[in-house]
């Protein structure tokens, strides 16, 4: 998404060009009221276009695989699966309505379209940025209730997931409406193109600051709070579960010894072991699933923060510092990092899916081995009891 400073009497294209294929210099001299001609670094422009094309291809392929996989198991989707689905849709929206128009714009240098198309393109680019953050926040809220308030979370239906995501998208469309009035087709020192108008000049600083706060700072604070509380809850529950597990094991061993002394092992010992084993496995399964979902979304959030931080830092720097190095290869690379977020998310989902499959396979094998050992032990106990009864009968006779 582009931000171009427009002064009341003269045009300076010094700020910004997100995903820009153009490296623009416009050294405006207020004293002489002169503007130097704009030069374009074609090599850097070509590199940016190629980078955006690769990002778009990887984003479409990765998220399409995720959506196809979820569609195949659509009858067994959990709430977490639904949020992954919505995150993938958001990434595709970024690819088609943010990265793709920007790549075309970078190729043509000037915006080739009508005034309505200019406003619509920049509006949808802003919507994509808001939605990427707000859908992540909605996912964090769901995971927070699943971990910290499991009883109330069980009452949540899939419809509530869609409502939360719908609210996130509506806020994105609402907060992006200023784009429809800021951007328009205008004549500048590079020709007729789509550019923003900020008059008076302080409105540029205000608008960029608002975008940074609404898209990056506030969502980051919310995500930090939610995941901080979740990690604390998991840690606290892990300690309590470990203590209760040790207590159950001691209690079970005591019952097992007592049954060997004076009670029937088949009537009590084996059945208690079976029930206890199922209970422990059940609790562990839920805990592992929740922790895994938290780790998954936390990885996505961390990736989002890493990719978007340089972009917003550069935006704020350029808005508030007139001497900011707003051009050059390094600055352009930092801006391009934000485009990587939409193409990395699906691969994070796939990696966690592979680890989940391996964990289930390993747990299944361990359960089979445990069951076999338990059955053999029970059979040996039965044989010993049978031999003991025979010896007692022989002694009586």
UniProtKB/Swiss-Prot annotation:
Task: List the top taxonomic levels of the source.
Answer: Eukaryota, Metazoa, Spiralia, Lophotrochozoa, Mollusca
- Summarize tissue expression: Present in brain, buccal ganglion, gastric ganglion, olfactory lube, peduncle lobe, optical lobe, pancreas, the oviduct and the ovary.
Q: Tell me the organism.
A: Octopus vulgaris (Common octopus)
- Name of encoding gene: CTR1
Cytoplasmic topological domain residue ranges: 70-91, 142-162, 227-293, 353-397
Record's SUPFAM superfamilies? Family A G protein-coupled receptor-like
Q: What does this protein do?
A: Acts as a receptor for cephalotocin.
Q: Which Pfam families match?
A: 7tm_1 (PF00001)
> Which InterPro entries does this chain map to?
GPCR_Rhodpsn (IPR000276), GPCR_Rhodpsn_7TM (IPR017452), Vasoprsn_rcpt (IPR001817)
Record-given protein name: Cephalotocin receptor 1
GO process terms (BP): cellular response to hormone stimulus; G protein-coupled receptor signaling pathway
What keywords sit in the KW lines?
Answer: Cell membrane, Disulfide bond, G-protein coupled receptor, Glycoprotein, Membrane, Receptor, Transducer, Transmembrane, Transmembrane helix
Q: Predominant location of this chain?
A: membrane
GO molecular function annotation: peptide binding; protein-hormone receptor activity; vasopressin receptor activity
Its cellular-component GO annotations read: membrane; plasma membrane
Family as reported in the entry's similarity comment: Belongs to the G-protein coupled receptor 1 family. Vasopressin/oxytocin receptor subfamily.
- Transmembrane segment boundaries: 49-69, 92-112, 121-141, 163-183, 206-226, 294-314, 332-352
């Amino acid at each position: 998404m582009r931000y171009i400073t427009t002064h009341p009497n003269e045009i300076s294209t010094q700020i910004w060009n997100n995903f820009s294929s153009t490296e623009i210099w416009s050294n405006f001299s207020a004293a002489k009221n002169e503007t130097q001609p704009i030069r374009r670094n074609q090599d850097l422009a070509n590199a940016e276009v190629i980078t955006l094309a690769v990002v778009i291809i990887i984003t479409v392929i990765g998220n399409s695989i995720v959506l196809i996989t979820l569609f195949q198991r659509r009858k067994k989707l959990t709430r977490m699966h639904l949020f992954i689905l919505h995150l993938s849709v958001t990434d595709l929206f970024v690819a088609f309505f943010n990265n793709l128009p920007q790549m075309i714009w970078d190729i043509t240098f000037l915006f080739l379209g009508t005034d309505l198309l200019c406003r619509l393109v920049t509006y949808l680019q802003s919507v994509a940025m808001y939605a990427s953050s707000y859908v992540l926040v909605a996912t964090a809220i769901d995971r927070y209730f699943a971990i910290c308030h499991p009883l109330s979370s069980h009452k949540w239906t899939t419809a509530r997931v869609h409502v939360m995501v719908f609210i996130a998208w509506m806020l994105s469309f609402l907060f992006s409406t200023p784009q429809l009035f800021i951007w328009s087709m205008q004549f500048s020192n590079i020709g007729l193109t789509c550019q923003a108008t900020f008059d008076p000049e302080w409105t540029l600083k205000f608008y960029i600051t608002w975008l940074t706060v609404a898209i990056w700072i506030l969502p980051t604070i919310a995500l930090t709070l939610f995941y901080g509380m979740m990690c604390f809850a998991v840690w606290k529950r892990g300690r309590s579960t470990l203590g209760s597990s040790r207590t159950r094991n001691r209690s079970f061993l005591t019952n097992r010894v007592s049954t060997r002394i004076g009670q029937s092992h088949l009537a009590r010992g084996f059945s208690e072991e079976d029930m206890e084993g199922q209970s422990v496995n059940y609790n562990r399964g839920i805990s592992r699933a929740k922790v895994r979902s938290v780790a998954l979304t936390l990885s996505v959030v961390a990736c989002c923060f890493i990719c978007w931080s340089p972009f917003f830092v550069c935006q704020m720097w350029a808005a508030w510092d007139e001497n900011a190095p707003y051009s050059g290869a390094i600055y352009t690379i930092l801006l391009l990092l934000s485009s990587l977020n939409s193409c990395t998310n699906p691969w994070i989902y796939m990696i966690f899916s592979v680890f989940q499959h391996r964990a289930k396979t390993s747990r299944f094998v361990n359960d089979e081995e445990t069951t076999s050992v338990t059955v053999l032990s029970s059979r040996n106990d039965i044989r010993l009891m049978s031999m003991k009864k025979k010896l007692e009968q022989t002694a009586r006779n």
